[in-house]
């Protein structure tokens, strides 16, 4: 005679299910037609329940009670005379309570064949729409669709608040062909905590955070969080339309790099982060008043270690909890756009950390990383390198980039550590790396990925800016992909940065012997579309602040810094400056503390801040400073060889009819009276800016706001003038308004 168990569970399926070894649970649990086709059978597994009834969702009536097959929690039963499947819920009685749930095992697969194909191919741009935790409506029932990629796992369950973290309750459906696991759970609340519980090929169990989670717990906790259903209502249409038609390589771009956790803090002891609403009220007006065109946010994907500054993210899709939720971040970006400020996001695609709840050996195998440490481990940071040749990994990264640009309206990505992606021998000794298929050192898979990424993003999101932090001489970083380039819009000019900061640190007496450090960058300025960056990396790890790098007394330090900024803003290329540098922060940056805003009580710091503000105003108002940034016609040296005086003079040109600007940079404390410079034409030239003005806390030497050029050729120009060059200064001269009008006529 058959027992209850083998009436409903054949071939030992009940034992396998109880032991967590039955992977095809959807073929067993839920509603199924009997073998003879004459009845419906419902099976479920509910620990600690003692009675289960099946209730029709359509009319709310009880259809049948299920038999308790064993004390472990297996229930099963037939649905009377019904032979047509119907939607149902389970009324479950526990010793002290009764609940009703919609049985998740009655639903079929929800994954789309096209999505699966693109994901495996490596070209899925919206993988976050079907992977992770997404709200879905299935046959009129609302719930959360969980999906994860784990092709080598023997079993995957979703565990969380909603099932008491029981790995046997919600075993997921496996798609053998592509390694995806899914389940639709109607009985989950927004804000619920969850993880994926995986049985590895060796039989070990590990709980992992959702790689596609859009919200995560605060460290040291690491559960993923079911997202809210509410959506942000965008109000940035004007900006998005303007962005789409803006040629940024011809437009002014002055980027303010920000670490949100330390720009400013609140609380009695500065122990609290500003939230997004605080940042809307404080950061945006400040950036606007200072004249910056963009904000660049250091990484905001969830990261457990504060000291990584976000460059070792574990939750690549989850905005960090530190400043608020996803809707708060969207509101911040929206407010920036309404203030006519763009927002660029630092994006980390070069490596990921080894935190055990993260991507490392996700399903018990090297899924996201390479198996061989010679390709899969980063020696500098002890992190793991993505396997860029694997389609699913490419889709994971491509979709993440699209996620930030599409869902959060970011205006571009600054990709961190591109150099480490491009070379297989990056930071490795001989014997520690594997050559490519042609015997070379280039990482062909990473190069292919970056080309694909840039091509697709520029096509999908008009007007964005893709920026590379790339420190080598790799050719074609900003060349179009159809010309065999990487396809970036801009590349950080690390050579200019290193040379110019080295020059800055030298005593003025010896700068004459290092004159080339400020002129050499113009030898290669047009080989890429460069961005001049003085980033956070230059004011940490014992390097000191910019002010600290400069020798001399305080007066010389401040004057030199103002002159340096003048040179930077006059030099071809877009601009990026790290927060605090705009008012000459004295101490190097500390991510644990706010910037030293109290310094603005002192005039020298006010002077530097005002100088940057006026430089930005001139930069945005004079097209000669941006429209021909990447064409040799936009720049001309007047004298690049005056090393003995450490004076640099050059002209910036715009399009026909645009007024040129003349820059005079003096990097010694000497004053030069009767100093002749060439000028584009005879007539009146305004002294637009003078960094030595009393307005900037200088010594107030100069030309009283006006220079008159005579018809005396000089330095290849048809006219010239005798001027006073103040100490450690930057002068910017431009045609007076009447001269500009005359020239246009």
UniProtKB/Swiss-Prot annotation:
Keywords linked to the UniProt accession: Carbohydrate metabolism, Glycogen biosynthesis, Glycogen metabolism, Glycosyltransferase, Transferase
Pfam families for the chain: Alpha-amylase, Alpha-amylase_C, CBM_48, GlgB_N
PANTHER family: 1,4-ALPHA-GLUCAN-BRANCHING ENZYME
Highest taxon of the lineage: Bacteria
Top-level EC class: transferase
SMART domains: Aamy
CDD domains: AmyAc_Glg_BE, E_set_GBE_prok_N
Catalyses which reaction(s): Transfers a segment of a (1->4)-alpha-D-glucan chain to a primary hydroxy group in a similar glucan chain
EC number(s) stated in the UniProt entry for this protein: 2.4.1.18
GO BP terms: glycogen biosynthetic process
Active-site annotation: 416 (nucleophile), 469 (proton donor)
GO molecular function, one term: cation binding
Keyword Signal (UniProt): no
Subunit-level organization: Monomer.
Family: Belongs to the glycosyl hydrolase 13 family. GlgB subfamily.
Naturally occurring in which organism (per UniProt): Shewanella putrefaciens (strain CN-32 / ATCC BAA-453)
Known function: Catalyzes the formation of the alpha-1,6-glucosidic linkages in glycogen by scission of a 1,4-alpha-linked oligosaccharide from growing alpha-1,4-glucan chains and the subsequent attachment of the oligosaccharide to the alpha-1,6 position.
Designated name of the protein: 1,4-alpha-glucan branching enzyme GlgB
